[in-house]
């Protein structure tokens, strides 16, 4: 039996099915407490980037790794190679938090 739902309905269904895990992942990232206002080197931002890389790997992205550049905060990097020629969506978000106040 094929799924007759629209792409949006399928996406919303997937979100509903995995929302608790996503919230747990987000809470874990916030608990790391990496603050980008603190200058590099910043060990908590490295831990935050490593946590994002682990999430990327779990999601099936390829080549997930932390990129560290001199004088800059770490970047979480990965590639999606699973569907050549398919539409691609990139969601960019900072993996740091801001200090209280």
Predicted regions and their residues:
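Acidic/His- and Gly-rich active-site-bordering loop/insert found
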Residues: 2-101
């Amino acid at each position: 039996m094929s799924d007759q739902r629209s792409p949006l309905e399928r996406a919303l269904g997937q979100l509903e099915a995995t929302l608790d895990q996503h919230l747990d992942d987000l809470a874990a990232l916030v608990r790391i407490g990496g603050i980008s206002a603190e200058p590099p080197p910043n060990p908590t931002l490295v831990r935050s980037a490593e946590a994002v890389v682990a999430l990327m790997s779990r999601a099936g992205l390829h080549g997930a790794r932390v990129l560290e550049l001199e004088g800059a905060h770490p970047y979480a990097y990965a590639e999606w190679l699973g569907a050549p020629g398919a539409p691609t969506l990139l969601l960019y978000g900072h993996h740091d938090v801001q200090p209280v106040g």
